[in-house]
Amino acid sequence: MSIDLKKRKVEEDVRSRGKNSKIFSPFRIIGNVSNGVPFATGTLGSTFYIVTCVGKTFQIYDANTLHLLFVSEKETPSSIVALSAHFHYVYAAYENKVGIYKRGIEEHLLELETDANVEHLCIFGDYLCASTDDNSIFIYKKSDPQDKYPSEFYTKLTVTEIQGGEIVSLQHLATYLNKLTVVTKSNVLLFNVRTGKLVFTSNEFPDQITTAEPAPVLDIIALGTVTGEVIMFNMRKGKRIRTIKIPQSRISSLSFRTDGSSHLSVGTSSGDLIFYDLDRRSRIHVLKNIHRESYGGVTQATFLNGQPIIVTSGGDNSLKEYVFDPSLSQGSGDVVVQPPRYLRSRGGHSQPPSYIAFADSQSHFMLSASKDRSLWSFSLRKDAQSQEMSQRLHKKQDGGRVGGSTIKSKFPEIVALAIENARIGEWENIITAHKDEKFARTWDMRNKRVGRWTFDTTDDGFVKSVAMSQCGNFGFIGSSNGSITIYNMQSGILRKKYKLHKRAVTGISLDGMNRKMVSCGLDGIVGFYDFNKSTLLGKLKLDAPITAMVYHRSSDLFALALDDLSIVVIDAVTQRVVRQLWGHSNRITAFDFSPEGRWIVSASLDSTIRTWDLPTGGCIDGIIVDNVATNVKFSPNGDLLATTHVTGNGICIWTNRAQFKTVSTRTIDESEFARMALPSTSVRGNDSMLSGALESNGGEDLNDIDFNTYTSLEQIDKELLTLSIGPRSKMNTLLHLDVIRKRSKPKEAPKKSEKLPFFLQLSGEKVGDEASVREGIAHETPEEIHRRDQEAQKKLDAEEQMNKFKVTGRLGFESHFTKQLREGSQSKDYSSLLATLINFSPAAVDLEIRSLNSFEPFDEIVWFIDALTQGLKSNKNFELYETFMSLLFKAHGDVIHANNKNQDIASALQNWEDVHKKEDRLDDLVKFCMGVAAFVTTA
């Protein structure tokens, strides 16, 4: 699809936002394709695009591939009720407004001067026509011929009850200049929009009209009725010219084929699509049940202009394309029209999902089961990769098919699901439990099809829970009567049986090594088993029935949801309760561990989604939603959270902010919960998962939070000796730095290889030397080159040393450490120097001490001793200052000893000695205590 516009960043409206969750940010919703609002088709050159409605947003697909091109940038205040497309622009009607969009970005908003809601749209020429539910028609016109879309109000038309009642459709017939055809439930009206006059009114039709479509023939419009009649009406003559009858069907959509074949498609509310050949006056093909009757059947069916392709949609959240192959000619001259062939489709659940699970470790696919009895594999990366899992049964062992009707109903609703990918592609890797069925089914994720085996319960109970071993070899079936059955996934053979529970088994799990199995049931019992020996290790009785279980393999923790509205966390190794989480005020619907096992996210009928921190046992985040969550699942890498809700056919995806920035783990109460809207299909500008996670959450700032944590004092009391809070290894490294360096030196230089392969015998230097000889350039050996480089370096070093001194003899350059040392001597405050010295690495400390000027008048050495004396007086970092003095004597001890009669050095050392002796009292006290203790113990 070629569009001559470039993407541009849209500045988000500055509006007051409510408080957001500090952990989760709404990202997007997957699985929504269309609803009952008829789609719109548009053309750009030779390409077509399709606009579908999904509640308060719309999506634009490329008709050639059904790839998603654009999504509206933001949700409308209320649901969209009508769509229309005209070249680059999409018109969406909601309430009393019409939004004009380009590439999903709102360009203009028209607000009708009425309280009635817009119901139908029609765009032709310079006009935009919008009808409302009070039978008014508002006409807008381009204010200038160069305008891209109509935006100026022109006139208003009114249809009275006498003229036909409720408006059904707005159409424009080809060659009817400035004329608008208004189809009501009983009449067809023709208005001149330029003058605002009613030009023509048809006779009243006996049956109620439900839809209308202009024919490619002049003056003809097709009308569909509630009784199943298709009326070809001539507007110029004002009479019927043909009637097609479809028994017991309400017609919902009409479309004419325009690629040379005179075919008419008729969509019905029962979900059938019927094709008529207008030349032969006969029905040629019927597509049965392409859309579900319970959701309105076919809401829209449209032939692409000049193409043998028809696009259909329905309220069952699906968009389909069918194509007519070239017709076959027979010898008698008859033409055989081949039935339309399924071409491509996009879809999703038609009812809210009942169970979800991530299908792989890369968070690429997600399995979703719904109340519509389907199992879908949704792609989080590319919508075109989503597809429904096939329920076609395998052949019997003798090669025959399973008996019965080929048009069968789907499997019952899935109530539990388990998946493991260790053996994907080798045999089935999915188990599902279905409502009111006494056996579980297997599925193959690679083939996207139901598997070969069905696993029966052994006590004639319904399947209530399923699980799989991490190796993918064993499947576990929990019964409503309390038994646990284990099957081999490859052969489908029964392997083990357990009977511990007296009521339904609600959860089964096995550790990663296939050693310990855990089960729970409505009887409140948690059972622990040795899987290899098939023995019971023990059981734990809880105070309330257990409704669900989630196991975290890496930590050997499992969480249980109880009927008393609590979540209990149990250690599988010790078989004890380690945490009990209280807070929900209604039944817990779903919960899940974070991948690292630190958090539990739970949802409840109290409309909250809570995040629990297991180390502290507190609730650290809460979200209040208007739509109760029924499932929550963390992605394997922890960057996403998937939720499903009571209403809505899609899967909501939330971004985990903790993956991208630090979040507070402070325990909060319900008054601090954030009320948030669910994710939607709309995208603001170029938003991505990362931008949503990093945006300001409008809540607490980490810098302004009192975390109630204790911070150790730097010094409890000035009279007490305080050691440094740094690692003990730092002092040891300082004391033995010379030994460490000696050990780190290589014992011998690396040796050259004596014999090299023929293709490595000439190094780059050797090749260059030989080239120099051939060119007549003087030869230099590597030793000569090295000697020349050393001499050049010596000259540079000498020049650098000379540049350090000015003519006055004062230093022209000094390091930051030396500068702090000099400034401290002037102010008699070395605190800044001491802070810098303590934060230095051992190597940096050694370098600075060795770099002290050891020539007369020994100012830097004296200043450094004074600084250490001041540090020792503060009683802070006691052992570090002692170590620094030891390093000073190691580096400059000979200079200090040789100049011990220097007045400045002697005075500085005397001050150090006085302070040091004063602090030596600690050593005397310790020795005294040791002596007394030794006397008492030996006396």
UniProtKB/Swiss-Prot annotation:
Compartments, record wording: Nucleus, Nucleolus
A GO-annotated cellular component: nucleus
UniProt free text on domains: The WD repeats are grouped into two tandem seven-bladed beta-propeller regions.
Additional free-text comment from the UniProt record: Present with 2020 molecules/cell in log phase SD medium.
Gene (UniProt): UTP21
Subunit structure, as described in the record: Interacts with snoRNA U3. Interacts with MPP10. Interacts (via WD repeats) with UTP18. Component of the ribosomal small subunit (SSU) processome composed of at least 40 protein subunits and snoRNA U3.
InterPro entries assigned: Quinoprotein_ADH-like_sf, SSU_processome_Utp21, WD40/YVTN_repeat-like_dom_sf, WD40_repeat_CS, WD40_repeat_dom_sf, WD40_rpt
Superkingdom of source: Eukaryota
Keyword rRNA processing (UniProt): yes
UniProt WD repeat ranges: 40-71, 81-111, 119-158, 168-201, 208-245, 252-287, 295-347, 354-388, 415-454, 463-497, 505-541, 546-581, 583-624, 626-664
Primary residence: nucleus
Official protein name in the record: U3 small nucleolar RNA-associated protein 21
UniProt-listed SMART domains: WD40
Pfam families to which the protein is assigned, alphabetical: Beta-prop_WDR36-Utp21_1st, Beta-prop_WDR36-Utp21_2nd, Utp21
Function: Involved in nucleolar processing of pre-18S ribosomal RNA and ribosome assembly.
N-acetylserine carried by residues: 2
GO biological process: maturation of SSU-rRNA; rRNA processing
Chain positions with Phosphoserine modification: 772
Keywords: Acetylation, Nucleus, Phosphoprotein, Repeat, Ribonucleoprotein, Ribosome biogenesis, rRNA processing, WD repeat
